[in-house]
Each structure stands twice: as structure tokens, then as C-alpha cells.
Amino acid sequence: MYSQHGAPMAPPQKPETFMLSNEAQQSLPHDAQVALQQVDNLKYFLLSAPVDWQPDQLIRRFLLPTGDYISCVLWSNLFHISGTDIVRCLAFRFQAFGRPVKNSKKFEEGIFSDLRNLKAGTDATLEEPKSPFLDFLYKNNCIRTQKKQKVFYWYSVPHDRLFLDALERDLKREKMGQEATTVAVSEPALSFEFDSSQSLYEQLTKAQQANSSSFAAHASTTYGQSASPVVRTVDAMPPPQMAPQMAPPSIPLLTDESANSQMYTSIPMPNPIPQNLIKREADYGAIQYDRNGMPIARIHQRHSSMPTFVEYSPAPSFVSSQYEDYSNRGLSFEPVTPPQHSSHIGPEPAYIANEDTGLYTAIPEMSTGSGFNPMMHLPPSNLASAHFPTPARTFHSNVYSVLEGSPTYKQRRRRSSIPPGAANPVTTGTHSPAPALSYAAHKPSDLRRSVSSSVAPGDTDDSRHESLHRSVNSTYTATLPQKNLMHEMSRNGTPLSSVGEHREQSSIPLTQAEDLPALPANGTVESGAPNGVGHKSDRYATGPVRRARSATMMELGPYPQKSHSCPIPSCGRLFKRLEHLKRHVRTHTQERPYPCPYCNKAFSRSDNLAQHRRIHEAQQDGQPLVHEDDLENDDNESVSHDEDESPSESVHPAVPGVHGMTSMPSSVALQSTMGSMMGSHMIAPQLLQQQI
């Protein structure tokens, strides 16, 4: 349906068909191909729903072939999707895949269980029963009940990952002879072969990596210059429905179909309109650039975890197409990230990313817009011509794929892997309060998300962070043995410093008053933070909680680079550090080089031994015992929980005498977050070893 220029390239690797060979994908029945095309249409809606909203518009719907509607809801300047609509999306995708749902209740339970990984305050908003928001969703058939529930931020939902996780659950049930929630009745589900040695998401990642070489091989031909003015598409993405008021008034709206290719040269144009208004590709130079300012030939060196379908996927913010015409890019119809300082122009709202929260919002009108927005006085891009060349655009590169959703999904413990010297295109002036002033100038306070009680506030602006850093230095050592604050905050709030900051400027997170008993509630900390971190409500309102940036500034996928591979052929797992690889190999060899001096029980990890020794010490002190099963589980679990937490990342540099401290294993993480269950003797295992 959509023309492809240049040499044919390998078909995109999609979750529904990545296990099939190229020949099998091409030979799918017509009904299956139509169903998969309908899935692509749904994906396009998930990509572009927040674009071109009217000032008074609150909801936008997409009609599924099943008769259900998927709704994108604008509420409090943020776009949302309900859990019920997420289930509807997945049920339709399973039906198009050839595995219709037969046990709806159990199917929904599995989806909502996965959605628990999207935390309130970070990837969702937690609504109280019968709140105005829930009432609006209920009246528009977005939810079935107005009970207390989470409503998810539009671009935090990992739609492809949810599909693969649900499919993997059913395939495992079938393999074990249990009843599955879906049943395979048609292609491509009947031809789908399941390899239980690794997750479907990992298999999709490897399939994309294998496909990227052939994808890049055709880059120079598929995306090269063409003499045809027909706008090209990527991966059969459907063209957007341009609003009539967005198009020049005298130019008829055209669809991007190959059958209409001859119409571009024969459209009668009125005399008052110059011919250069319809010039499309003549405005491009010999080299095209992607949204990150890279030459287009290099865009295919993407991270392997990024699906081909959303290679040009948007960041979670857009500028209205009144100023950003789709058809003037010659790549695909997806929205792209606006310049960092874009602001409100004219009567239609413009949307911009909040680099701290990963969300997007409507920008208020500013009288000094020319100082913030270098493109404000330029003509709209749909009028670009030889007289008004399309301006070069710079884009914020800290983005993640919309269909992959939040990078923190099932990766709550990952840390940023940006080197200390990496350039920071967003945050500057770490030693002055200038960033806070700049934030207030073009980021309205209503953006700031309410934080649930289970999520501790992260570091806000750099001036407050640095003043807290200085004031806590004298007391942090005294409070560390009572409660492992760094570990607790990394599990609850995932506080992260701004990308590009030096290790010495990394965070002591803003903790709750009860977590810092040695600090005065309104003393030195409050003096360093004028907005008042001594009061919980004030702290929650003074700034947004930073998103856990497991997707780093230089990487498009959520996984950091790893260079050490497991030597076991059937495993081949990759690790960032050699010590993590050695620790992982012990899970294969069952080597346990750390015996307990009390009972001679051996462990494969030193931190598990340290935790085990605390059981003996607690028994001697008359404290309640920690369940031994937790140690057994930790002894055999993978090192994914701490493979990205090196000593330099986990320990605060201002703590004297504590070096090389890593985070505690997951069984201690549960105890560290429950103050009532943790005594003053529960300290970090590495610190315990140093004391011994």
C-alpha cells in the first residue's frame, strides 16, 4: 500500500512475528496480514495520540476492530491511559496474533500484575475512589469501576513488553499442561515456536540485533534522496489524518498512496499561491539528519532493544503540527521531539518534555518568548521554501521508545551508566540556583506530580541538593549504621543526580524527617533548601521526582553496554563488570567459597555470608530470626540486582572510612524498607566485614 524506495530491506522484527522466518512472514494468510496491519494502526495511535489537541479537548479515542475504544485522556496537563484500556489493547493484539482470549478474568489478572511494576508517582497517578478524574474516565467508558486505582502516564506503558510477558505466561502454562488464558487458533500463533531457555523479550532483542545488520545495509538506498515527491514511510506506518485547519487552505488533502503518486505533478494551483509552497524534498541538502542531529545513515546503529517499528518513535512530548508539518521530513509520519525551549505560540497549545520527569505538558504563554524559543519568529515549517529554509533543529536526546514504555519496568534497581565526564545538554550550572530559576520560567508548577507515600522524594534542583550535601556530611556517618539510607532510598525513590554530573556531586537523597533522626527538622537542612525540606508536604511540592534514568543519555534502549559474556554456551549472559561475571559463573558451578565460621554453611557470595552471620548475631542478642529461605534464594539468584551498582555508584563520597560498599541483596532490601522490622544492628554487609 505504501511505496518503498530503493532495495528491499529485511522485514521489521515485531513481537507478533519475530520468531518466524522472512519467508514465513511473507507467506502468512491474507487475514493474518490484515490483522497485523490493524495492530500497526493501533501502534500508530499509541505513538501519536497526544498530537494536535484543541485547547478544550480532554479525550481522544481509537476504535478497535473488536468494537472497544482506546482513550487518550488529558488531565492535569498530562496524558493518561487506564489499565482497562491497556487490557483492551492487549486482548485485541492477542486476537490479531491468532490467540484469542478465552479466560478473560485470569488474563486481566496477569496484565494488572505486570502493571504493578509501573509505580505511582513515577509512571502513574494513584487516584482516590470516585475522584473527579475517575468520574470522568468512568463516564467515558475508560474504566469499569471508580475504586482506588492507578491511571498510567501515556508513554510509561511498555505495550510490547506487556504483550510478550502475557504470551510467555500462556506458553509456559501450555508447556506444563496447565490451562492457558488464550488459545492458538490461527496464524501466526500456530507457527510460533517457544524457546523456554530465555524470555521472549530477550529473544526479541536478539532478533532485532540480528536484523539490524541487514536493516543498516539498505540505509543508503531505502532512505536516500528520491526524485519522487511522494512522502516515504517507515515499516508501513499509516499516515496521519491531518486536521483540515492545519493544511494550507488552497491545497487539497492527499493520502500517501502509491496510486496517487501522479497527482502531485498535476494538481491545479491558484495563481496567488507561489509554486514553492508545494516543494517538498527540494529543501533538503545532500545529507539528512535524524531527531538527534545525527546523519541519517548512522541512525540505524540503534540499540538492539529498540523495536524496528518505533525506530523513529517520539519522545514523550510534541509540538503541534501547525509548526511541525509531518510531510516535510521525508522519513516517517511519527511526531518527534521539539527543541528544548519550545513554548506556547498562538492559540494552540504546544507540548514539551520535562527532562526531569520524562512527561510532557502544555507550555504557558511567555511574554519574553524570543529569549527562550529560538524558533518562535520563524515561519511554520509547512510554509518552508527557498525563501524560508527549514531551520536546523536540536533535540533533547534523553528519550525512550513509546512502545517499550518506562525504562524502569521490571528494572527498578538499574542505575544510570553515563560516565562522569559525559556532556550534559540539559542541566548546567550545578553550583548555582540558576537551573531552578530556569525551571520556574518555563515549567509550570502544576506539572509537578503528587508523590505517593510509598515513593520517597528524589533530589530536586541542584542548589538544594548541594546544600543538603554539605549539611549532612557531619551527621551521615552517625546515622548510617542505624539505617542504610543509601540502600533504602535506592529501592524506594531511586534518587539520581542529573546526567553528566560528577560523582562527587551525586546525591544524598532528600529523605523523610524520620530517616534522619540526627538532623534538626528545621535547622541546617532547611536553611540550605529555602523551600523547606523539613516538612513532608513542602518537600513533596517543591519539585518533581526524577525518573529513574536507566535509559541513559547516549543509549536509546534501557540496557547499558555489557562486555563480559558467560562462558557457558547455553547461557551466554552479558555483564558490565568482570566480578559480576565471576559471581554469576558460581551459579553454574555451585561453588561456595564463603563458609560461615559459626555453622560452616557455605555461600557463593560474600554479602550472603554477611547477612547469614547477622542471623547468628541476632540470635545471640535475642532478636527475632530472619527466615533462612531468603538467603537460599539470594544464594542462587542472578546478579542482575547489583550488576549495575558499582561501589563508586552506591557509596556517598562524603562518608569517611567507608569504601567499596555495595548495595545489599534483595532479601535485605525488604527489611531495610520496613523500619519496624529492622534493628539498629542491621547495617550494610560490607561495613560489617570491615568492622570484623
Swiss-Prot record:
It is found in: Nucleus. InterPro entries: Ste12 (IPR003120), STE12_transcription_factor (IPR052127), Znf_C2H2_sf (IPR036236), Znf_C2H2_type (IPR013087). GO terms for biological process: negative regulation of DNA-templated transcription; negative regulation of transcription by RNA polymerase II; regulation of secondary metabolite biosynthetic process; sexual reproduction; sporocarp development involved in sexual reproduction. It holds the Pfam family zf-C2H2. Residues 56-165 bind DNA. A zinc finger (C2H2-type) spans 564-588, 594-616. Residues 470-482 have a biased composition (Polar residues). Its main location: nucleus. GO terms for cellular component: nucleus; Ste12p-Dig1p-Dig2p complex; Tec1p-Ste12p-Dig1p complex. Keywords: DNA-binding, Metal-binding, Nucleus, Repeat, Repressor, Transcription, Transcription regulation, Zinc, Zinc-finger. The keyword Zinc-finger applies. It comes from the Eukaryota. One of its GO terms (molecular function) is sequence-specific DNA binding. The keyword Transcription applies. Residues 406-507, 519-540, 618-665 are annotated as: Disordered. Residues 629-647 have a biased composition (Acidic residues). PANTHER family: PROTEIN STE12. Transcription factor involved in sexual reproduction. Required for cleistothecial development and ascosporogenesis. Not required for asexual reproduction (conidiation). May act to repress medA expression. Belongs to the STE12 transcription factor family. This is Transcription factor steA. It comes from Emericella nidulans (strain FGSC A4 / ATCC 38163 / CBS 112.46 / NRRL 194 / M139) (Aspergillus nidulans). The gene is steA.
